[in-house]
């Protein structure tokens, strides 16, 4: 069966939680109030993330992209993407974070053209405050990862993630690579996963398995 890889961005491709860090930087008081509720899953991602982003003035958008510019990526991504290209395996980023931040980091690394597709949150900056736009919103998520995955049927799905935004993606995937908070969530639900720390490890696992 052919394969497809779905990968989170913040804290997964980046070595630090870029999106959460940005929210703490540009909306510190509201982040301190809302983010614990999202991690505890007492507030939906859709409502919490929208509220946080739409509290930030539009004039800060350039600063947000500059904030992302300096954030390091996790080791082995370039090699992993080269491996996937050799195997003709699509690599799709699905993120609850900002599309512009994702593209900024990938351009810096020279990897933007190695990615099959990117699904993230778009921001409108014409008004006084940022306005959130997502084509993949559902009742609980601004970017409904399982809904996007459902577009790609008849293939083995591989998910790579690290946190609360990746739970629905992990539930739907045939094979899950998890780290950080996502491990705790999956253990609580008795969901199988493979722990990982860098993309070299994922490449090695897939090589040995095949």
Curated annotation (Swiss-Prot):
GO molecular function: 2-hydroxy-3-keto-5-methylthiopentenyl-1-phosphate phosphatase activity; L-phosphoserine phosphatase activity; magnesium ion binding
GO biological process, one term: L-serine biosynthetic process
Chemical reaction(s) catalysed: 2-hydroxy-5-methylsulfanyl-3-oxopent-1-enyl phosphate + H2O = 1,2-dihydroxy-5-(methylsulfanyl)pent-1-en-3-one + phosphate
A single GO cellular-component term on record: cytoplasm
rRNA processing in keyword set: no
Entry EC number(s): 3.1.3.87
Keywords for this protein: Amino-acid biosynthesis, Hydrolase, Methionine biosynthesis
A Pfam family matched in the record: HAD
Keyword DNA-binding: no
Superkingdom per UniProt: Bacteria
Pathway assigned to this chain's UniProt record: Amino-acid biosynthesis; L-methionine biosynthesis via salvage pathway; L-methionine from S-methyl-5-thio-alpha-D-ribose 1-phosphate: step 4/6
Class in the EC hierarchy, top level: hydrolase
Function summary: Dephosphorylates 2-hydroxy-3-keto-5-methylthiopentenyl-1-phosphate (HK-MTPenyl-1-P) yielding 1,2-dihydroxy-3-keto-5-methylthiopentene (DHK-MTPene).
Family: Belongs to the HAD-like hydrolase superfamily. MtnX family.
Record NCBIfam families: HAD-SF-IB (TIGR01488)
Protein's name according to its UniProt entry: 2-hydroxy-3-keto-5-methylthiopentenyl-1-phosphate phosphatase
Origin organism lineage: Bacteria, Bacillati, Cyanobacteriota, Cyanophyceae, Oscillatoriophycideae
Gene name tied to this protein: mtnX
């Amino acid at each position: 069966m052919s394969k497809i890889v779905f990968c989170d961005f913040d804290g997964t491709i980046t070595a630090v939680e870029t999106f959460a860090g940005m929210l703490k930087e540009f909306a510190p008081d509201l982040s301190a109030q809302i983010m614990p509720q999202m991690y505890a899953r007492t507030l939906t991602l859709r409502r919490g993330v929208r509220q946080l982003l739409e509290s930030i003035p539009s004039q800060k958008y350039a600063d947000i992209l500059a904030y992302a510019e300096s954030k390091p990526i996790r080791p082995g991504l370039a090699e992993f993407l080269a491996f996937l290209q050799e195997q003709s395996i699509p690599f799709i980023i699905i993120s609850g974070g900002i599309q512009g931040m994702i593209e900024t980091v990938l351009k810096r690394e020279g990897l933007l053209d190695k990615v099959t597709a990117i699904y993230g949150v778009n921001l409108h900056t014409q008004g006084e405050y940022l306005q959130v736009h997502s084509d993949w919103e559902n009742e609980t998520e601004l970017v409904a990862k399982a809904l996007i995955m459902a577009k790609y049927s008849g293939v083995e799905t591989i998910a790579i993630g690290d946190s609360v935004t990746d739970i629905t993606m992990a539930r739907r995937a045939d094979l899950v690579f998890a780290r950080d908070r996502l491990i705790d969530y999956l253990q609580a639900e008795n969901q199988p996963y493979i722990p990982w720390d860098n993309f070299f490890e994922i490449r090695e696992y897939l090589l040995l398995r095949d």
